Amino acid sequence: MGGYILGGGHSPLSSLYGLAADQVLSAEVVTPDGRFVTADFTQNTDLFWALRGGGGSTFGVVTSITVKAHPDLPVTASTFSFTVGGNNGSITSENFWTAVRNYLDYFPSLSSQGIYAYWFIIPTATGPMFLMQPFWAPGKTLEETNALLAPWFAQLTALNITFTPKTVHYDSFYPGWLASFPLEAVEKTHVATGSRLFPKENWESPESLNATFEAIKTSSQANLTIIAFIIDPSLKNGGYPDNSANPAWRNTYAHVLQSINWAQGASAAVQLQARQNFTFGFMQRWRDVSQGAGSYLGESDILEPDFQQSFYGTFYDRLLKIKKQLDPKDVFFAQTAVGSESWKVVTANGLPSGDGRLCRV
């Protein structure tokens, strides 16, 4: 849980309660000089601020964290999918993408209701598949959840897209989460992933939302996998925390990832070319339509240019100052962590990796 909380941390309750970092009340830490300290709102306050969102492997070894406890609540979850070529070939590519574009229109209203939607666009043999797994409605009844989905479902029906949603109400959070969310795999060695926190301004005009949609569509049509969330961990939802979580989190309706893969066992040259195309091609398109926004460092591209702005935003200068004060000898290091620009990892094959020699820049 350390890296999850220290890096910000999003969850199925983020549109209600904010980020994981927003829940922290105190932390016990071993500092780089070997002291065991408590950091909270009254002592070691700079360290406490930095730990809540400024990234792991940077400021100390966190041995324990005290967090807020929220009351259990009921939840309704819905899962469904539709695929180009489905319904005996009746779902056309044009209608599929119209459906996805329509879906984006609902992000502001859904997030205002505390919704956290976990959705995918996955390449298949017949064309892309849209998968919702799940549409997560904490505190909502079955009827309320169906009402939230009804406008978009009506549009899907009008587009001749048939689907069979499985919508289930649970009296408690944990059984709902256990039944609704997929088993996650660790990152694979033949996959590169990057993310973008698309800003709320992108929903302020049809032109900007269309540009966002086209950037996502372009990646999907190149057979990249899209993994995304409706999410709104705003300052209001997080209880107006004063912490170091990326400010881009406070101004988004959508955390969207894309991933590219190459053949297992591919040469270093092939892998490097794929990564370059991904970082400076597909990811650059996303940056171009969300200038000044950011990326979630916990689900990010290791080659992200200007990672200081993307992962930490306007908080980077303060974080770097705290890093230099607490860890002047750079006892702690992680790639793309605060202060890591003073170092580089030199690998034998030139691939970006933490497996190599750590050298001063």
Can you annotate each of these PLM segments?
Residues M1-V361:
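Soluble FAD-dependent oxygen oxidases
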